Amino acid sequence: MGWCLLMMSNEDSILIFEYFTASGEKDKCIISEAEALIFNLLDDLKDYNLTLVIDKSYEDLIGEYENVNPILIEENLIDWLENNATKYKKAIFIAAENDNNLYNISKILEDNNVETYNSSAEACSISSNKFKTYESLFNIVPQPRSFKIKIDPKGYWKRAIDNLYKKWKSEDPLSSFKIILKPLNGVDCEDIVILEDIDDLSYDLEKIFPPGSRILVQDYIEGIDVSVSLLCDGRNAIPICLNEQFVELKNDRGTYLGGRSPFTSKHKDEAFQTH
């Protein structure tokens, strides 16, 4: 069996990988979900010839898949892709948006004429940047008011946020009001700050958002945190399931704790509406 797999043509095989399991990540908070994703993908594609890029530590776990030709690596995944992507015609991969991994991997594959069953590099660039996403959906779907601000070295950003907060609050002075500050790029509630009182704003914010970085300032919307999983060909979107996300807000900071899927809600049909 092993020799047949090794003789498999790259043109007949789909290159697949998951970023963390291919990178040798050992953080249990990350790797348990990553392992579930890649092994579920292998199960879903059991009728196809696959080339799996995975860290060498998983060598004993992939022998049961007769349709899989494993490539066990110990080097950096991005380096491996830059040197080997040109050998393949098709690819499916799983990666988070951290550090622009999703965009960088998509761009490498596209530049090497690999057909991917993922979003395009351009789409990844937009969706990984919160303000680009806001601009692309402007006047298409309801969104909280949003403003992009640069954390400049002279501290003018503090005055800008202060003025923005007071302007928005003056429009509805009797309601409770909060704003949320987010990095332009980031996932899983990474480095978010919630301000209920503008007097809580201080230059300590530069410990979270260093000078030179850009942030998104938005209305904070109370409610249940959800997401929708969907399939899209660039024109048509097919919703698959509604997911609940568990976010802990403590000391005006947010921490992503995980999620539940599927999530049942009376608002499901509304969430599934496409434009």
Task: Enumerate the language-model features and the residues they cover.
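Short catalytic helix/loop segments, enriched in acidic residues and glycine
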Residues: 29-44
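Short, Lys/Arg-enriched N-terminal segments with co-localized hydrophobic residues
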Residues: 1-6
